[in-house]
A protein has these predicted regions:
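Phosphate/dinucleotide-binding and metal-coordinating scaffold of catalytic cores
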Residues: 1-327
Length: 327
């Protein structure tokens, strides 16, 4: 299988960057990537998008199971759960057994409009960017109450989630990381926001506390995106935060610290991983290393002050600019 990779961080248009090859053996997928010769000749960027992908022609292979740069474009637990449920519904409708889904299925199952970062994917160079299902566009702000109800019903009984409810959730939620119920929402001005809904497993109003912590971070001088809080039920509040990888309709390339440091899920102090790895990366490839290292220190102190223990390398990341990466 060949997946054609496009980028839209070097110009206003989507440019063919290279091909991700997916080979399946014994039910496992194996990956390799090859840059487009034309893209290599024309690109003005000299910053690696993945520690395992260098600026030369020919196939390149990941040192781990997969390339981190493409893993960042995949959904995490919540989005994968929705895509799995969609496959079971489709299999039931077609009277067949559900397919075993692989990473490439999840990668291509994300709706293109709301995909994280500035990479886009096709399986046909003359076709549409995937996923292109018109039924799964980001819903308007006015549907938040309905989306919260759909996510609650899914958590209670995923078999309850029929095709109608699933479309309400999968269209905005499949592109996002993390395990909590969430969705992309389009604000009246056209900007994209992330809505994080209350969960049946919450022991307190998590959304309200996230908003409090977010506002405290801003008061302490940390760089945080715009946020809001809405309440639609007795279960708790919905916390909303503006997407930082969009500037209007322009896509901004984002990569997790996990990817750029060449780490894998579960990396911790036990294997030598630390904030110093992020500092070293910023010193070598950062556009504003001094400023970003100060920002990182503020995050460390703030997380300690508010007892934030959910602090791992997927919760830190970098934005690509023409001058380098920024925290």
């Amino acid at each position: 299988m060949e997946i054609y990779v496009y980028e839209c961080f070097s110009s206003s248009e989507s440019r063919f960057m290279g091909t991700l090859f997916v080979d399946t053996a014994k039910r496992n997928e194996h990956y390799s990537f090859e840059y487009s010769d034309e893209w290599l000749k024309e690109t003005k960027f000299s910053y690696q998008l993945d520690p395992d992908i260098f600026f030369y022609s020919g196939r390149q292979f990941p040192s781990k199971n997969e390339f981190g740069v493409f893993a960042d474009s995949c959904p995490d637990r919540w989005g994968r759960a929705l895509i799995n449920r969609r496959e079971r519904i489709q299999a039931d409708r077609e009277k067949r057994k559900p397919r075993e889904l692989h990473t490439s299925d999840y990668l291509l199952g994300v709706y293109d409009e709301t995909r994280m970062g500035a990479l886009r994917f096709k399986t046909d160079k003359d076709g549409e960017f995937l996923s292109n299902d018109s039924d799964v566009a980001a819903p308007p702000w006015t549907t938040l109450r309905t989306l919260e109800e759909a996510s609650r019903n899914y958590e209670i009984d995923e078999d309850f989630l029929n095709d109608k409810w699933l479309k309400q959730l999968i269209k905005p939620g499949s592109s996002l990381g993390g395990a909590r119920p969430k969705a992309n929402i389009e604000a009246p001005d056209g900007s994209l926001w992330i809505a994080k809904f209350p969960s049946k497993n919450d022991e307190c109003n998590i959304g309200a506390w996230e908003k409090v912590t977010h506002d405290l971070a801003k008061l302490c001088g940390l760089s945080v995106p715009e946020s809001k809080l809405e309440t639609f039920s007795k279960l708790g509040s919905t916390f909303l935060v503006k997407r930082f990888d969009r500037d209007g309709k322009k896509r901004i390339h984002f990569s997790s610290a996990m990817t750029m440091l060449g780490k894998t899920d579960g990396a911790s102090a036990d294997d030598g991983s630390s904030y110093l790895d992020i500092v070293s990366f910023l010193k070598s490839y950062g556009a504003n290393p001094k400023q970003d290292i100060v920002e990182l220190w503020k995050r460390i102190v703030f997380n300690m002050a508010v007892n934030n223990t959910d602090d791992h390398l997927r919760n830190h990341g970098f934005i690509l600019t023409k001058s380098g990466w920024v925290l």
